[in-house]
Amino acid sequence: MTEAFDSGAFLSTVSGRPGVYRMFDSDARLLYVGKAKSLKKRLASYFRKTGLAPKTAALVGRIAQVETTITSNETEALLLEQTLIKEWRPPYNILLRDDKSYPYVFLSDGQFPRLSIHRGAKKAKGKYFGPYPSAGAIRESLSLLQKTFFVRQCEDSYYKNRTRPCLQYQIKRCKAPCVGLVEPEVYAEDVRHSVMFLEGRSHALTNELSTAMEEAAINLEFERAAELRDQIALLRRVQDQQSMEGGTGDIDVIAAFVNPGGACVHLISVRGGRVLGSKNFFPQVGIEEEVAEVMAAFLGQYFISSPERDLPSELIVNVVHEDFPALIEAIQALRGRELSISHRVRGTRARWQQLAVTNAEQALGARLANRQHVAARFEALAEVLNLDEPPQRLECYDISHSSGEATVASCVVFGPEGAIKSDYRRYNIEGVTAGDDYAAMHQALTRRFSKLKEGEGKLPDILLVDGGKGQLSMARDVLNELAVPDLILLGVAKGATRKAGFETLYLNDAANEFTLRGDSPALHLIQQIRDEAHRFAITGHRARRGKTRRTSTLEGVAGVGPTRRRDLLKHFGGLQELSRASIEEIAKAPGISKKLAESIYANLHSE
């Protein structure tokens, strides 16, 4: 906090009413915008002597001036906050990056309408469907419609100047209205069917086509019946892929995931019970941001700062935040529509919620694995460790078990271009006291570096051990026992709060202890490798434990004898694949009823 700013004098003048506050530095640059139910209480929390998060402490240290605006209620404060964030994009706020407007499917007017992707203002005459979360999602729908109903997608200038059918006609993607090869009434029917699909009425459309197919067969119009059959097959395939069981409404499933170095919000858009697609967002965040804070900031900026975006009737999220009631009230006031938000969901909705979480986690992982991103972090690590050049190979080890059961050690390897997965290794630990992580690590390192002494594998530049002084000392003992040439040892211990960003690091021995700033790229690299070793160890442990626990699992299921057991495993390709299948997927196997599928599923997931 700058010397010029007297927080005590300032707080004595602040109102306890709802409002918005703006923090500026000594150069009058806007640092942060926030809203509060009580301005006095919220602003007082910034000037406590202890307990501030690193990012908050850094912000407070730069404050030279604070301005407030009183509002009539919390909803009004939230709306003003989002307006100011959108206009000024302060560096200490969680910021959703600018994005192009969402695309729509556009059906033009005229005797032979055209289907196309549209962004921006809706000036042209015709119908708009969407919005879709991405252009890729639209292309999937347009591709299906082109294969199914043959509505043209060419530019009007191209369409008006044709003298013979183009390639799309030859490959059965268009009926060539440009040269009069289709009657207007027939084309209009194809357009009507396309509209039904785009409006989410694909089940009604399928039923209508099924009736038409039966009539064609009765009238001995076998070619027409075959065409309708193919259309129905395409529609049912996409229904299986896109349908959301038990739902016909408009829903956005949104999951936020935060990891050292970044955050991702994944949005799945469901309209009329049909999945239109999904999209990843990567907000600008500080390292210690909580996932609920990221979610609240995203919802505000996504639905309030961009009112042109489509609003569903329900949001399904993976976290809750105290601001959600005010957020929903503000969105409803702005849009004039009802909106519900759900966190605890069951059944299919819970699976969609988990799918969004998984997608957010994987998308962020892929982003962090970007080669240039990783290379820059390697350079930062070299600077921190005073190395002449960036290391070329880092190995990290971790241990995973369940109360000593099925202990597995992992070794993951990273280079300047990212993870070297071909060099990953797992070690099934045997002959040690259950739960003795030191002995397990000793065995894993001994096996790894004994192979190195025999000429197998490469020597790492840095050996990273997930653990404190004890694990580091044990690793040093192993290297000394095997006379391994000097390499850098780095121990990573969780800090007092056990939160990411507060790790304690040990270089080569327990006496050389240090920490890095939470926003350090070098620390981000260490965290990324440590977390990958943890993930790889856990998956190996679960697989080993599961293999032990599920041996002959199917033998205990009533109604599944040797023949049916063999057929089931053949159908799914093995027990592991069968274990991943849902009840509905198991029931689709030959000779398996829904009730038997439930018994099989329950047996496989009894642990």
From Swiss-Prot:
Record Pfam families: GIY-YIG (PF01541), HHH_5 (PF14520), UVR (PF02151), UvrC_RNaseH (PF22920), UvrC_RNaseH_dom (PF08459)
GO biological process: nucleotide-excision repair; SOS response
Subcellular localization: Cytoplasm
Keywords from the UniProt entry: Cytoplasm, DNA damage, DNA excision, DNA repair, Excision nuclease, SOS response
Lineage: superkingdom: Bacteria
Cited function: The UvrABC repair system catalyzes the recognition and processing of DNA lesions. UvrC both incises the 5' and 3' sides of the lesion. The N-terminal half is responsible for the 3' incision and the C-terminal half is responsible for the 5' incision.
Gene: uvrC
Domain (UVR): residue spans on this chain: 203-238
Taxonomic source organism: Pseudomonas fluorescens (strain Pf0-1)
Protein name as catalogued: UvrABC system protein C
A single GO molecular function term of this UniProt record: excinuclease ABC activity
GO cellular component: cytoplasm; excinuclease repair complex
Assembly with partners or alone: Interacts with UvrB in an incision complex.
